[in-house]
Amino acid sequence: MSGRNRGPPPPSMKGGSYSGLQAPVHQPPFVRGLGGGPVPPPPHPSMIDDSREPQFRVDARGLPPQFSILEDRLAAQNQDVQGLLADNQRLAATHVALKQELEVAQHELQRIMHYIDSLRAEEEIMMREMYDKSMRSEMELREVDAMRAEIQKIRADIKEFTSGRQELTSQVHLMTQDLARLTADLQQIPTLTAEIENTKQELQRARAAIDYEKKGYAENYEHGKIMEHKLVAMARELEKLRAEIANSETSAYANGPVGNPGGVAYGGGYGNPEAGYPVNPYQPNYTMNPAQTGVVGYYPPPYGPQAAWAGGYDPQQQQQQQPPPQGQGHR
């Protein structure tokens, strides 16, 4: 027991080690043996005397030196036990103090941990806020880019609208001029209306004249057919007369010159095979409307006051001069 070396307690303690906290070291006031600790108290004077002269001095009790040595050793061990008890008490007090300090340190550590957790929560909140701000900033930047593109588009639209406005201004100017001309033309509308009314009246009169001429043409066409049949009959009779005259002339040449029996007169000279027909002494019993000559599809009859009957009857010429049937020339 005298050779024990009581140094500082080990660093590892119950409850774990905590960084930043160092347990206080309790140093006993004296340590037996070789340890380099504090200086022990001086021994008892009797022991000093015994150590100086052990072989020459006898114990007062009359004991031999060996028993006195054992007794001294027991006393020393008793003293060591007392010292160990004192050390144990001091260690118990130190343990209680360390335990209290540990509780305080744990409480402080918990407070620090809570503070660290709060700091971490605040840091996370700040990081989230910063992230949200960065996201909002990025969205705002994108919106700014979109707004820039839209502004450029708006500027292009403004240029187009400006050019369109100029074109519309020129068109409005032209339309104003056209409106002025139309206004001048509108002022002439009453005159044009009067002219249109006059033209309508003339057209109605022309239609009435055309209807009248249609009726007259139908009547004249029927009358012309009758006259045609009569003329054909007269032409046949004239041919017969010509044949008879030719036969009589032939017989007269054969019999010699004789007078003209019957007093027949020949027109155009003697010996002319085509005797001239006399002019028609009869005038037609209808008159021509001078407005009818300009009507499209109108064919005047092949007779009238200007027609002179001369020469033989030509059926082909009569067919060419014959007007179309009623209903085809007037539509």
Swiss-Prot record:
Feature: compositional bias, Pro residues: 322-331
The keyword Zinc-finger is assigned to this record: no
InterPro entries hit by this protein: FLX/FLX-like
Biased composition regions of type Low complexity, renumbered to the chain: 306-321
Keywords, in A-Z order: Coiled coil, Developmental protein, Differentiation, Flowering
Description of the deletion phenotype: No suppression of FRI activity.
GO BP field: cell differentiation; flower development
Keyword DNA damage: no
Segments for region (Disordered): 1-51, 306-331
Coiled coil: 69-252
Transmembrane region(s): none
Domain of life: Eukaryota
Any one annotated GO CC term: nucleus
UniProt function note: Has no transcriptional activation activity.
Assembly with partners or alone: Interacts with FRI.
Family note: Belongs to the FLX family.
Protein name, per record: Protein FLX-like 1
Organism, as annotated: Arabidopsis thaliana
Gene: FLXL1
